[in-house]
Amino acid sequence: MEKIFLNGEFVSPSEAKVSYNDRGYVFGDGIYEYIRVYNGKLFTVTEHYERFLRSANEIGLDLNYSVEELIELSRKLVDMNQIETGVIYIQATRGVAERNHSFPTPEVEPAIVAYTKSYDRPYDHLENGVNGVTVEDIRWLRCDIKSLNLLGNVLAKEYAVKYNAVEAIQHRGETVTEGSSSNAYAIKDGVIYTHPINNYILNGITRIVIKKIAEDYNIPFKEETFTVDFLRNADEVIVSSTSAEVTPVIKLDGEPVNDGKVGPITRQLQEGFEKYIESHSI
């Protein structure tokens, strides 16, 4: 029987209930992580949970869990649910309290929920590429926190769906930031460009992996801002995330990226990613 982790216990889905006064439900007052499972093993799980605890610290949420404890509960969940290829979703909120914008009193404990699901790798997207669109970035100014507040991302993603695209690449003014659920990259003249780490983007775990792969393959990797026009005129465009992995964007705003085919550097990164899965899954 499927199990859900809820506040320290492994329970059935029918028992996994939260209060209508949970601050995650009322305010989006919480954080989350999304972790890949390959061949029954957790991929880059330490990096994910280090970020999870950083996000918690940034919003003043004391979870009383170590990275090691979070990894252990994740392993148990994967084993219980017999997940081979899939994901773990975990979120923590500031707990259950009467509706009030200020933080609740100290005795209110955080609420933590985690569950698994089988989730295939996006082989078609990886092989053939996807369509993308550009859209103004209307999100808040702490995108470095993996917050439950995702309305701006949801609206951007729905804009992409409306125009038959898989991802919306966002920009503040003319500066490209990231995708609605991914980091974004422009590849030009053999160099990979992506927005530098600051409050405007999430430091994606797959982004970190891509940077390491680029170093291994001696591909220049520049963390600097670039414009929408630069993106549209790139030789290759990719987006990356836990679920998307290294996905090529072959059409942007209805126009082909370069010749509309998946490029050679993208293929190198994908090759390196396969090796990274083998070496960084536990």
Curated annotation (Swiss-Prot):
SUPFAM superfamilies: D-aminoacid aminotransferase-like PLP-dependent enzymes. Keywords: Aminotransferase, Pyridoxal phosphate, Transferase. It catalyses: D-alanine + 2-oxoglutarate = D-glutamate + pyruvate. One of its GO terms (molecular function) is D-alanine-2-oxoglutarate aminotransferase activity. GO terms for cellular component: cytosol. Substrate binds at residues 32, 99, 101. InterPro entries: Aminotrans_IV, Aminotrans_IV_CS, Aminotransferase-like, BCAT-like_C, BCAT-like_N, Class-IV_PLP-Dep_Aminotrnsfr, D_amino_transT. Its cofactor is pyridoxal 5'-phosphate. Pyridoxal 5'-phosphate binds at residues 51, 178. GO terms for biological process: D-amino acid biosynthetic process; D-amino acid catabolic process. Homodimer. Acts on the D-isomers of alanine, leucine, aspartate, glutamate, aminobutyrate, norvaline and asparagine. The enzyme transfers an amino group from a substrate D-amino acid to the pyridoxal phosphate cofactor to form pyridoxamine and an alpha-keto acid in the first half-reaction. The second half-reaction is the reverse of the first, transferring the amino group from the pyridoxamine to a second alpha-keto acid to form the product D-amino acid via a ping-pong mechanism. This is an important process in the formation of D-alanine and D-glutamate, which are essential bacterial cell wall components. Belongs to the class-IV pyridoxal-phosphate-dependent aminotransferase family. This is D-alanine aminotransferase. It comes from Staphylococcus aureus (strain MSSA476). The lineage of its organism: Bacteria, Bacillati, Bacillota, Bacilli, Bacillales. The gene is dat.
